[in-house]
């Protein structure tokens, strides 16, 4: 899906787990997280500089082959998602891939002290329909693999910049 050694933006990288996997697979990685603590932990884990910035404040300085937003953009209110997704889609090379995941559902609000925007396949497709030059490649609904959470469902989507 991505060229060998391609450049990936890990958007909302959390602990850096996925950034580390991408680095080990030979990709060039840039990572950013909105939590100073998580950005620091990710930097320590990966050995690379991880930027601390919100999705709204971070300005991509490169063009990417892929953007990985695993369980991260779900913390953006639904009303703000079109502008955020469009901003990052514009940082993709033509043919570049954008992975996004959301909890499956229709909730948009606070849950356990944090904001969550859940998505259905229909609401996700409507979101992407409003983003110029981005198309949905594949949507898959999966169960959470963490212990005790098999009843939680996730919407996983691969999009492509055209």
Labelled PLM ranges:
Residues 95-102:
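Conserved beta-strand signature within the Rossmann-like core of class I S-adenosyl-L-methionine
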Residues 134-145:
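Conserved S-adenosyl-L-methionine
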Residues 146-162:
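Core SAM-dependent methyltransferase catalytic element
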